Amino acid sequence: MANTLFDRTIAFAGICQAASLVQKMAKDGHCDQEAFDTAIQSILETNPSNTVAVYGKESNLRIGLECLVRDFDNTPSGSELTRYLISLMALERKLAGHRDGMSKLGERIGTIERQLEHFDIHDEQMLSNIASIYLDVISPMGPRIQVTGTPSVLQQPMTQHKVRALLLSGIRSAVLWRQVGGKRRHLIFGRKKMVEQAKIILARI
């Protein structure tokens, strides 16, 4: 895959979208269904032809692109999103240096793909299986991501499955970010360029 500003912007928008959906799901118990489906589908796209193919099409990343453009302010909501982003990228770095973890992740995703021949991806059992990949493979690498939200919402098993599945999709996008050459310096010094690129994409979708 190409290491261009466009590719980095798409991948980073994927991480932003996952973080934004986690925040919404944890507070309200629901989020944009199309964006959620895009996130889950991205986990299964293990051999994409290009960066956009991970998400299907550019318009499937509208929430993430808007989140990227809006920037993260110092409000509690903005600080929370920033924390999720930093945590996801830190976990991906641990995963990248853990060959066994990457191998296990690939095996577990392969199992999900086989199960999808018989079950719908929206079934509670399937979402539970996807969530368990995050719990079993990613979470033990630490540091643990503390998800904050509405306690009564977060206590519901289905919400927990969806939040963990979304966190796994965030890791998927962070892996993609690294694959297309994304580095910390791009976030510090190249953020303005990514915002401009995101605006261009948003204008055409």
From Swiss-Prot:
Protein topology in the membrane: Peripheral membrane protein
Pfam families linked: DUF489 (PF04356)
Signal peptide: none
Keywords of the record: Cell inner membrane, Cell membrane, Cytoplasm, Membrane
GO cellular component, one term: cytoplasm
Compartment list: Cytoplasm; Cell inner membrane
Domain of life of the organism encoding this protein: Bacteria
Family the entry assigns: Belongs to the HflD family.
Name the record gives this protein: High frequency lysogenization protein HflD homolog
Gene giving rise to this polypeptide: hflD
